[in-house]
Regions:
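Active-site neighborhoods and metal-handling regions in enzymes and metal-associated proteins
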Residues: 4, 8-103
Length: 103
């Protein structure tokens, strides 16, 4: 099979569409909620806390702020947060795993 080298710029131009002012404002509002959610979860990250508890805090905060967790239910994903601890590469599920010092 022969590979062809091409500029990724052509591909990205097809994928990325300019946003309207309204879309930009929605993105800004969502980014603020995400930032505040991470800060809220960050308050309780400590040894002895489970990743399920981190998820509960995040989901509650998101919903209390009038938003919907985007990962929850997407392609069957069971949680509001993707939590990858230690050797979990990406998109880890929250569980009864108890955080330890150094995680």
């Amino acid at each position: 099979m022969d590979a062809q080298v091409c500029s990724s710029l052509k591909i990205f131009r097809k994928m990325v569409k300019p946003k309207t002012e309204e879309e930009i404002e929605l993105l800004r509002e969502n980014a603020i909620i995400v930032s505040k959610t991470l800060a809220e979860v960050g308050k309780i990250v400590a040894p002895g806390v489970t990743t399920l508890e981190l998820n509960r805090v995040a989901e509650t905060f998101i919903r209390d702020n009038g938003a919907i967790p985007s990962f929850l239910g997407y392609e069957g994903f069971p949680a509001a947060l993707c939590l990858s601890v230690n050797d979990v590469v990406v998109h880890g599920f929250p569980s009864n795993y108890v955080l330890k010092e150094g995680d």
